[in-house]
């Protein structure tokens, strides 16, 4: 177990070292917990979170039966894209945080693209 955690931490550092959000193209960071999914749009040059969404957001909290499914990830992706477009953000850099680009991560990214964000 310890070795797999070390490998994951290495992947996180490797991916994060290559990705940096700017004012023009902020970073869309995704975290996948055991029970919930979180997404943030971050401007690294100023150190400011521009928008955030999760399965714990008031807009989604009562509407989802189970919070860790692909459908929940799609809902979070649509919500984060909606909030970003309201703030004037159209282009982002996708930070998958070492997770494989399948399942929930892919569903969140695809829905965010369909809702108006460009990666």
Swiss-Prot record:
Part of the 50S ribosomal subunit; part of the 5S rRNA/L5/L18/L25 subcomplex. Contacts the 5S and 23S rRNAs. It comes from Endomicrobium trichonymphae. This is one of the proteins that bind and probably mediate the attachment of the 5S RNA into the large ribosomal subunit, where it forms part of the central protuberance. GO terms for biological process: translation. InterPro entries: Ribosomal_uL18_bac-type, Ribosomal_uL18_bac/euk. GO terms for cellular component: cytosolic large ribosomal subunit. This is Large ribosomal subunit protein uL18. Belongs to the universal ribosomal protein uL18 family. GO terms for molecular function: 5S rRNA binding; structural constituent of ribosome. Keywords: Ribonucleoprotein, Ribosomal protein, RNA-binding, rRNA-binding. The gene is rplR.
